[in-house]
Each structure stands twice: as C-alpha cells, then as structure tokens.
Amino acid sequence: MDKKGKIERTVIILMVIALWMLAALNSYIPEKAEPADEHEGILRFHVIANSDSARDQELKLGVRDYVLPKIEKEITSRMTGADADCDIAEEYAEHNLERIKKWALRYVRDKGFDYDVTTEVGVKAIPAKQYDDLYFPAGNYKALTITIGEGKGQNWWCVVFPPL
C-alpha cells in the first residue's frame, strides 16, 4: 500500500472512531425537557424583596414560605376533580388580594420590619425556568405578585397552578 493509501485509511479509521465516540457521548447527554404547551392555564407566584440586602432577601423568602402554603391550600380546597383549572386559581387570587396582603404584612411585621406590602394579579414577563421535567419558556404569564417595601430587590418565582 502506498503512502497516500495509508493516509486515507488512517483518516477513515479516525472518522469512524470520532463518530462512534460522538454516538456514545450522545447517550449520556440528558434530553431537554418538553416545553410547556402555552402560557395560558398557568398562574405564577412572584415575590419581590424591598432591596438586595441580606436581611431583605431573607424576609422575601420568609414571606414566600409563610404565604405560599396558605394560597396552595385555599386553591386546592376549591378544586374538585375535573373542575381543576387555572381559572379557579386566578379567580381565587384576584378575589383574595387583600387577604393575601394581610398574610404577607403580618409576617413582615412579626419579623420587625415596617415595610408596606402590595399584592396584584397581572401579566408579567417571566424568565425561562426548569422545574424537574417541565420547562417554562420565557414569556408573559399571569402572576400573583407580592411586593415588599420599595420592591427594588431580587425577586423569586414559582408556579401556583398547575401544582407541580
């Protein structure tokens, strides 16, 4: 075999090895989760801190931990089998803004802060988020938002409905 033939054979062998390695590597790469079908039918929960100070960020997470289980419990109690849809969750949020505000304000006051709290339901631009195998692309979602104080701090997002 001449020199040119040996080079061609070596190149072919290296290409076959490279393709085999790529195929093997591909089997170890997890598949991307399926995107959520659409932004309707989803109610997000958004808490915005007063500032980026450590205390305000801790307070934001405390408000989340105090209020979210109450909201989830109340929404779940209104759902019955086939009637479980986002309209019920949105209606609950819209009709209970004052109640949700009182819960958040109680927590803020109990922690020794004098910040005001506002609550609203509206459409918000929300960044992409992965929850286990469910992917929510960036976009506009209906959200229940609690803003603490000036609302100039980092925020926190989750999904209220559908329950994850």
PLM features: what roles do these ranges have?
Residues 48-52, 122-124, 149-151, 161-164:
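Solvent-exposed coil/turn segments that connect beta secondary-structure elements
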Residues 85-128:
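Amphipathic, coiled-coil-like alpha-helical scaffolding segments used for oligomerization/assembly
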Residues 42-48, 116-120, 143-147, 157-159:
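Soluble periplasmic/extracytoplasmic beta-strand elements of cell-envelope proteins
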Residues 1-7:
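Short, Lys/Arg-rich N-terminal segment immediately upstream of the first membrane anchor
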